[in-house]
């Protein structure tokens, strides 16, 4: 894909018509081939699937740069729901740092799991700790970051 200098249209075609392996290859190539947010629909599609390999591939550096706060928070929760290790989420430390809305969402999820007698994923505690530190990226309020 990189050698072919595939544009967003070509990447979309390969992703849409490709196998799971080809879709993952497209997602991994995005940060190297698409400088702006034009390929976000591919990331969003992968995050809607139940294929944990696609979800993990979708959360690379491209998503870290281009997903808005709302989408990114829900992607982190999807990882917890589906068992995708949060080590696969690019730029997790920076994006989670100081994110009080993510902290609230994580606490709610942990409470639901506990009330249902289910274990709370270990990754949740690590990310919750990250939300307690202030990151420069989250030092100012994001008008679109508030969940409803």
Task: Give residue spans per PLM region.
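Alpha-helical scaffold domains
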Residues: 1-148
């Amino acid at each position: 894909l990189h050698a072919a200098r595939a544009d967003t249209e070509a990447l979309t075609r390969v992703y849409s018509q490709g196998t799971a392996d080809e879709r993952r290859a497209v997602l991994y190539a995005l940060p190297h081939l698409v400088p702006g947010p034009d390929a976000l629909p591919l990331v969003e599609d992968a995050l809607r699937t139940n294929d944990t390999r696609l979800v993990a591939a979708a959360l690379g550096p491209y998503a870290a740069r281009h997903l808005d706060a709302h989408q990114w928070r829900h992607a982190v929760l999807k990882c917890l729901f589906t068992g995708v290790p949060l080590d696969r989420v690019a730029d997790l430390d920076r994006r989670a740092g100081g994110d009080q809305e993510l902290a609230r969402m994580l606490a709610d999820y942990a409470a639901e799991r506990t009330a249902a007698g289910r274990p709370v994923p270990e990754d949740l505690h690590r990310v919750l700790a990250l939300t307690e530190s202030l990151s420069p990226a989250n030092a100012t309020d994001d008008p679109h970051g508030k969940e409803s």
